[in-house]
């Protein structure tokens, strides 16, 4: 007769946890030390006679990282494909046993065209009708916000939708209304014990299939909190979605399959693609970058069950777990300031902190709007970088509960911007022109190799244009990251609603300072090289390499820009005129 294994005692579990923490800290410090030493020492692994074409230990480390990341992403795609074949063999989902799901949509001053696409796609989701609820919460209850409520009522007209305009929200002060008829000093008065608006919202959400609530403005986190709190424990899973997102009909079903297959998975995200890639060169490059971010970087994380961020446009959470950390998630503070951005990343971190896995599936897909102007894109990236640095610190507390890859990748990605900035400044101020050009060639070469792998994985030649994103990172995103680092405790939506686009010029300041630093260093280096003696054999070889390298760099840009203008701008119809909003 088999005997049950004894459960470990509380002391044993505590010791095991402390040991894992200690080993994780040692591993993180080891990675940090090796990277810093490899960068600072500049150990060359291969070099030509004059040291002009050199390949160092740090470059080898980054190359190995990219190869490993690509390999694990490929293996994860194969794993997802195998799971899809198993699901297909099981047949369609049984409506009687399907998990109940609530689709929550966060809306704020949305472009009516995008909002209509979002709501229409929500209607078209291929999921058992009786097991799916739709809840949209509008951040704002003024007259100019109610067009979103009207559109919800119009799109779901045949579903008997319920709409409610709430004067407050869950966290706005509420004054009980006195009962009428009680007059005179000391007279008996009856007051309402609870907010009638909250009670009405919760009653509608838990009894009606399609509900839209417009509440007092409070920010996106307030909107999401209302949806989660009002739902309570009435559903099994909660899907998050933004109002500018168009869902693929199979998006929800594929997410549900991931959670159904493994109870250890607490949340799963899908493939977010760009809805407006042809609006501008910024949105086009963003569309390529998005694909790699999800199908290479997050696919790699998913292989180790530790996706760092379930993206807001398309994610699914186990509701019983979400309700456990809902209050802590909403009340998050950083340096004494209440956090109002980085909602999706902190939701993911809360799930990881409980020891549950987070996954990504490329079979679930949606299309979301991205900024088409450089200024708005810069504001968006600054906001995302703020939440990244802040959540990096929180995420570090739970590295020991997950695979070592989570620790390794967090350290590498966290240090990377600082090493890039240090390299650029050192070359501009202390390096020779050829050294600067050699680094630029290496950067574009690595970017082209990564783009070529993405083109092969996706089966789309146009992905090679992703290599053009490298200069955008170096010149725009890198200084924005440092602005984000020093302004992490400043809260807000970060980007404006799409109905009324507002320019934010604050992120331009670090770009201007960065440009002045680089121009100053370049002028200094050019002046020094102009006075140098170029008659020696090493200098002659450097001049030859400089001419050949400059020719290769210019040729690369000519080819890539030609592909972009001919293959993208001229052969694809571009949406012009920005947003045409009619309410």
Swiss-Prot record:
Glycans are attached at residue 489. Changing residue 314 to V: Loss of HA activity. Residues 46-51, 426-435, 484-501, 567-583 are extracellular. GO terms for molecular function: hyaluronan synthase activity. The chain crosses the membrane at residues 25-45, 52-72, 405-425, 436-456, 463-483, 502-522, 546-566. One of its GO terms (cellular component) is cytoplasm. GO terms for biological process: estrous cycle; extracellular matrix assembly; hyaluronan biosynthetic process; polysaccharide biosynthetic process. Changing residue 383 to K: 85%-90% decrease of both activities. Residues 1-24, 73-404, 457-462, 523-545 are cytoplasmic. Pathway: Glycan biosynthesis; hyaluronan biosynthesis. Its EC number is 2.4.1.212. Its cofactor is Mg(2+). SUPFAM superfamilies: Nucleotide-diphospho-sugar transferases (SSF53448). This is Hyaluronan synthase 1. It comes from Mus musculus.
């Amino acid at each position: 007769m088999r005997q049950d294994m004894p459960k470990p005692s509380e002391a044993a579990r505590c010791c095991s946890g402390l040991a894992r923490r200690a080993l994780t800290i040692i591993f993180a410090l080891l990675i940090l030390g090796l990277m810093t030493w490899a960068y600072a020492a500049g150990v060359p692994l291969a070099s030509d006679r004059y040291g002009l074409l050199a390949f160092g230990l740090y470059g080898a480390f980054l190359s190995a990282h990219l190869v490993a990341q690509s390999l694990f992403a490929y293996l994860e795609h194969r794993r997802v494909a195998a799971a899809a074949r198993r699901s297909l063999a099981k047949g369609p989902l049984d409506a009687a046993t399907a998990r109940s799901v609530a689709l929550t949509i966060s809306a704020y001053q949305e472009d009516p065209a995008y909002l209509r696409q979002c709501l229409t796609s929500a209607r078209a989701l291929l999921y058992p009708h009786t097991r799916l609820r739709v809840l949209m919460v509008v951040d704002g209850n003024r007259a100019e916000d109610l067009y979103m409520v009207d559109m919800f009522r119009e799109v779901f007209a045949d579903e008997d939708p319920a709409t409610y305009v709430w004067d407050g929200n869950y966290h706005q002060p509420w004054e009980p209304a006195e009962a009428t008829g009680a007059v005179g000093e000391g007279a008996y008065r009856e007051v309402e014990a609870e907010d009638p608006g909250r009670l009405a919202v919760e009653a509608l959400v838990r009894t009606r299939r399609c509900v839209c609530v417009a509440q007092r403005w409070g920010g996106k986190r307030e909107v999401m909190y209302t949806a989660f709190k009002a739902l309570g424990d009435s559903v099994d899973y909660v899907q998050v979605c933004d109002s500018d997102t168009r869902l693929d009909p199979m998006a929800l079903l594929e997410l549900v399959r991931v959670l159904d297959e493994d109870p250890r998975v607490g949340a799963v995200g899908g493939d977010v693609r760009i809805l407006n890639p042809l609006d501008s060169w910024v949105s086009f490059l963003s569309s390529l970058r998005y694909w790699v971010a999800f199908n290479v970087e997050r696919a790699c994380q998913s292989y180790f069950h530790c996706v760092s961020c379930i993206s807001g446009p398309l994610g699914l959470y186990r509701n019983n777990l979400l309700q456990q950390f809902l209050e802590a998630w909403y009340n998050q503070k950083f340096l004494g300031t209440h956090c109002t951005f980085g909602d999706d990343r902190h939701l993911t971190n809360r799930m990881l902190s409980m020891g549950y896995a987070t996954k990504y599936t490329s079979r679930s897909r949606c299309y979301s709007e991205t900024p088409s102007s450089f200024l708005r894109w810069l504001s968006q990236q600054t906001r995302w970088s703020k939440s990244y640095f802040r959540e990096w610190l929180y995420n570090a507390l739970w590295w020991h509960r997950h695979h070592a890859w989570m620790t390794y990748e967090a350290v590498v990605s966290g240090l990377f911007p600082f090493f890039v900035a240090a390299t650029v400044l050192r070359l501009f101020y202390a390096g020779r022109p050829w050294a600067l050009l050699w680094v630029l060639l290496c950067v574009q070469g690595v970017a082209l190799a990564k783009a070529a792998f993405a083109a092969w994985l996706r089966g789309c030649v146009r992905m090679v244009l992703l290599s053009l994103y490298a200069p955008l990172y170096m010149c725009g995103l890198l200084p924005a990251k440092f602005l984000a680092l020093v302004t992490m405790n400043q809260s807000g939506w970060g980007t404006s609603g799409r109905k009324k686009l507002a320019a934010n010029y604050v992120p331009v300041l670090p770009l201007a300072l960065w440009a002045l630093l680089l121009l100053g260093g370049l002028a200094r280096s050019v002046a020094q090289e102009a006075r140098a003696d170029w008659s020696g054999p090493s200098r002659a070889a450097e001049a030859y390499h400089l001419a050949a390298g400059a020719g290769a760099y210019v040729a690369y840009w000519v080819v890539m820009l030609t592909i972009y203008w001919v293959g993208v701008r001229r052969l694809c119809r571009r949406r012009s005129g920005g947003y045409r909003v009619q309410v």
